[in-house]
């Protein structure tokens, strides 16, 4: 194959060639069907771009593509270098995405058939030489090759170059088979099996054959068959789709400018214009076409007549006409549909892969778990989770009955209890691997909510919102004059550019606005109207008070009419009213009674009253009391006129009326003459004590009559920001969020983190992860982050510091700790010089502005104990009683007692006083007694306690033991062990239940004797369950007997088990019951002590004293 010269610039295709039909709509019906299938499958595939078009071509290199499409026309008739068919490209050639010639599958199929036919024609041409000679002469005359218009070269075509000069995309390889249509790598891509070749009689007349052009096929029928193949296919399609019509023939569309309506041989689908995605061709590109030759024009006439293609320029004008384009942009519809499909597809993908999380429990939603889907936001939740949420207090709607969705806050009335599929037709749907989880697998059939669409969703049961209805409908504009094709379910109303011209509310004028929805605006023409009486006029809009005109006026001014009545004597007293005025009420034929209405005039005429002739004659009076009701008084007592029957208004009332205050709390009596109106009231001085609506303040209004006491004060409470106060009227509940905002950047202290404006009031500075850059008191390393507080956190670096009293040098002390106490006493010498500070290690002075109050340690002169008075450094010790405690004992040493020192000395003084009393006789005889020796320091220390009865009994026992030569170590009288075995608490508990103690002691004695006499080294006894006090007695007695005691079980079945051990368990010499009985018995009186006294040295003693000083018999004084 000869190679064409290189091409520079853009490709030029001959727009007049047969194969270059940029806006061919021959197969629009099939394209519409394919497009509808693509729309219905978009959600399932989540693929929003149409599949790549079929390109019937071979894999031709880029250089060969340039050679194929490059050819110049030579007017001189010279043959070009390239023998291949070439086309002059127009700049408007589209990319592979457009629906031009190279994207039409039916065109490729037709080219394939033409290719076979031309091959047959070429074989016949080679066999006949005369035909070849004629063919060469024809070429020289016309200067063109027949193969320029042969469709067989279309198989060499590839995707057209982009208008911007981009490299064309790689063409798709097709594998030819005996099936219908081409197959892409074994896959059937397009099937067009209904095309048939038209019969020869369907072809056009022979005059359509171009002059000077010889076809390779010498047969005329073969020539017609090749030329009219496209036309026959088009006729076949029109028979299959008789309802199709071009877009400009849609009902309600306006005619295209510069074009007469075509004959309707067949109707095309109304959506064909919407399915065509081919962009308009610029007018500049149309003007750049080269001039057509005569041959080209004739060839174009034949081709246009055979294939009935649409003119390119007219199609461009139709697409650019703004009146023909639908008012709803398809781009916006695709955008909305894409958002819906993205939401639904995302839900399907996440539910299928189990990656969707429940917003309540934050757990993954499994394919087998029961779920519930919100019909407002389409979020999916676990059924159990949404039940718990719906019953929780947090889900309750404010002021409404129902519960709120956790995602969209949509209020629902009923709590879901059943697990249903997304469309709601099947309960408890079973999960299938081939279906969407939680769906029933049937068609959705849900209606579009809130839209005027009769169609239902035709997708399978799915989560998320249903896609918009894909159907189209013809909708009338608001004024009803034009109709437009719009998407079904579109809530947008259609408007045309015509005026409305509906009758306005006045009924006279027409609406001059453009086509609009709703009612027309009231008529805006201003008219001047006069009232019925003619005294007042006004300017109103046309249509105001329609139907109220009486021919003279149009409204009532609410003034007295004042027109002259027919009588000519009186004027109309009614309020301004439509004509005519009523008759004069004083006419004789109208007046039937006296002025008070109690007596008819006929009776008065019989009594001699004169008859009335005109309205000016007075009405006769009956002479009775008028009795007409007056406006004063009350409902219980109505005041009446007290005058005699009279004409005109009744006079003032002479009685009094009781009126109430505004709040009806108090009443007041006033003369009727002072009442100016029937509803006369006054204000009392009672203040309202009810709470205002804010709940914080009281009303406090005087004579309040309000039902809702609104608070006029300003709230004034601080808002959450802490900087501003609420400026709204005082209200209940929490204040609103502070609406103040700053338009300055809010940064952290170091400036690394920034919050850009607007910044709501009260917003805290952003958190920063950088290290704090402030100047710190210490030079230790900084470990805390940047912060907004004024003070940095304390430094925690461990250091060594002295305590406050300089006692210890402590380690591991945080740097921020300053005053450290070691916990030891201060021991610093106080200013008094005698004492030391007793406080723990502290800071500062030991005593601040206060004297030392520690006790004085100076020994007393009389007893030697310290002074113990508050510290008195500069003064002598005060004379006070010594409060030190000393130990006193009796003469035998058995009794010991701690006594205050001053009390001990007073006891000695009492003893000394008794001794002085014995010498009182000497004082009576004139003698003197020296008492200085009675109270001495030594004698004070020798103070003793008096022996008691036990001391005497113990003394007797000692003497008896000495008499029988019994050693004291043997303890014959059980003096040391008798009181040491049993404790005081055991004795007190045993006194409460002696019988129980006796039984326990018997059991223990038996147990101890059994283990000592038996063969076993241990033996146990279990006591029955008992209370805590009895168990404590058993434990204490077990210690006395040398037994082991353990408590088992729990209350109230807790008991004690005692165990006797040989060699350890011993019975005490005296039982506890015996000790208690001896103590409880009455003691015998103690023996009378006998003291030996020396003979009285005083010769003057009386005989009475001698008798009293008899010797005391000592029964234990055994003398040898």
UniProtKB/Swiss-Prot annotation:
The keyword Transmembrane helix does not apply. Residues 73-106, 124-141, 1097-1106 have a biased composition (Polar residues). Belongs to the NFX1 family. Induction: By IFNG/IFN-gamma. Residues 111-120 have a biased composition (Basic residues). Keywords: Activator, DNA-binding, Host-virus interaction, Metal-binding, Nucleus, Phosphoprotein, Repeat, Repressor, Transcription, Transcription regulation, Transferase, Ubl conjugation, Ubl conjugation pathway, Zinc, Zinc-finger. Pfam families: R3H, zf-NF-X1. It is found in: Nucleus. A zinc finger (NF-X1-type) spans 453-471, 506-525, 567-586, 632-655, 694-713, 721-740, 832-854, 863-884. PROSITE patterns: R3H, ZF_RING_2. GO terms for molecular function: DNA-binding transcription factor activity, RNA polymerase II-specific; DNA-binding transcription repressor activity, RNA polymerase II-specific; RNA binding; RNA polymerase II transcription regulatory region sequence-specific DNA binding; ubiquitin protein ligase activity; zinc ion binding. Residues 22-295, 1081-1109 are annotated as: Disordered. This is Transcriptional repressor NF-X1. GO terms for biological process: inflammatory response; negative regulation of MHC class II biosynthetic process; negative regulation of transcription by RNA polymerase II; protein autoubiquitination; protein ubiquitination; transcription by RNA polymerase II. Isoform 1 interacts with PABPC1 and PABPC4. The modification Phosphoserine is found at residues 50, 82, 95, 129, 150, 326. The RING-type zinc finger domain interacts with an ubiquitin-conjugating enzyme (E2) and facilitates ubiquitination. Gene3D superfamilies: R3H-like domain (3.30.1370.50). It comes from Homo sapiens. Residues 9-26 are annotated as: Interaction with PABPC1 and PABC4. Residues 142-159, 188-202, 222-254, 282-291 have a biased composition (Basic and acidic residues).
